[in-house]
């Protein structure tokens, strides 16, 4: 009878482990077309959506999926993880493939906070947005804080990174109605005429949407609210807008 020897990675000096650790850096993620996820929930979401390349589990963990699997010791997980309390399950994922743009589009101009981007992605899935287009100056989609904030919803929606000055005119030529959030005026989101094909543009946390981007839009919109409140967090505002558009 042949003895099967199970490989368990225990050294943080191992080249394979070092290369996995490098996926915490954007430059290496872009080079490899891969990114890291941490925790069982995210791993299961990635697996369900055919994005999981490799499962990484702590030795003697009974969790299993039909995918390439690495068993590692706790010190290796702690070395790889970005969390204070490392998870016992991690994964290496393929970066998302860009799909055809759907009829309901959310465009983000310069959103910088990882938590905001993650929350916006969750809201977009909740309110049936087909496609999210990130401007090139947005925070990296595969930033670990963004990924955790999405709670796995990044695997359930088409997300592209584009030059907005090139992409918005293309959408206009395809008969999308281009709407933009604008603190300086426009139409109440509750009163606008809805189109089957639309793109809504939301801007940076501090500066809002760039003026040159606003000039590319068909209509400015705002959320009517108590005059004592000057503004809302971008993730909160986006959630309200997407809810109204989904009615």
Show which residues each predicted segment covers.
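Boundary-proximal intrinsically disordered activation/regulatory segments immediately upstream
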Residues: 3-59, 138-139
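Short acidic-hydrophobic, aromatic-tinged amphipathic segments that line or gate anion-handling sites
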Residues: 8-11, 70-73, 158-165, 221
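Active-site regions of enzymes building and remodeling cell-envelope glycoconjugates
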Residues: 64-76, 103-104, 196-199, 218
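Glycine/small-residue-rich loop that forms an oxyanion/phosphate-binding "nest" at active or ligand-binding sites
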Residues: 69-97
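Short beta->alpha connector loops at strand-helix junctions that form conserved
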Residues: 72-73, 109, 135-136, 158, ...
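RNA substrate-binding interface of SAM-dependent RNA methyltransferases
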Residues: 101-184
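Structured adenosyl-cofactor binding patch, chiefly the S-adenosyl-L-methionine
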Residues: 126-127, 146-154, 211-247
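Active-site/ligand-binding-proximal alpha/beta "capping" segment
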Residues: 180-227
């Amino acid at each position: 009878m042949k003895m099967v020897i199970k490989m368990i990675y225990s050294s943080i000096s191992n080249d394979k482990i070092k290369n996995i650790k490098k996926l915490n850096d954007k430059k290496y993620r872009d080079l490899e077309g891969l990114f890291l996820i941490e925790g069982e929930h995210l791993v299961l979401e990635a697996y369900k959506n055919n994005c999981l390349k490799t499962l990484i589990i702590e030795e003697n963990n009974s969790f299993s999926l039909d995918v390439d699997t690495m068993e590692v010791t706790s010190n290796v997980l702690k070395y790889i993880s970005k969390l204070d309390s490392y998870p016992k399950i991690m994964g290496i994922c393929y970066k998302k493939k860009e799909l055809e743009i759907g009829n309901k589009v959310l465009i983000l101009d310069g959103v910088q906070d990882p938590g905001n981007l993650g929350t916006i992605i969750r809201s977009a899935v909740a309110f049936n947005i087909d496609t999210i287009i990130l401007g090139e100056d947005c925070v990296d989609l595969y930033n670990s804080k963004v990924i955790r904030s999405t709670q796995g919803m990044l695997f359930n929606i088409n997300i592209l990174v584009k030059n907005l000055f090139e992409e918005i005119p293309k959408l206009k030529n395809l008969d999308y109605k281009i709407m933009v959030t604008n603190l300086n005026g426009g139409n109440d989101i509750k009163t606008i005429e809805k189109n089957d094909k639309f793109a809504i543009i939301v801007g940076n946390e501090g500066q809002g949407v760039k003026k040159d981007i606003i000039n590319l839009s068909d209509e400015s919109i705002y959320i009517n609210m108590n005059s004592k409140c000057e503004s809302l967090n971008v993730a909160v505002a986006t959630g309200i807008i997407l809810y109204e558009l989904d009615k």
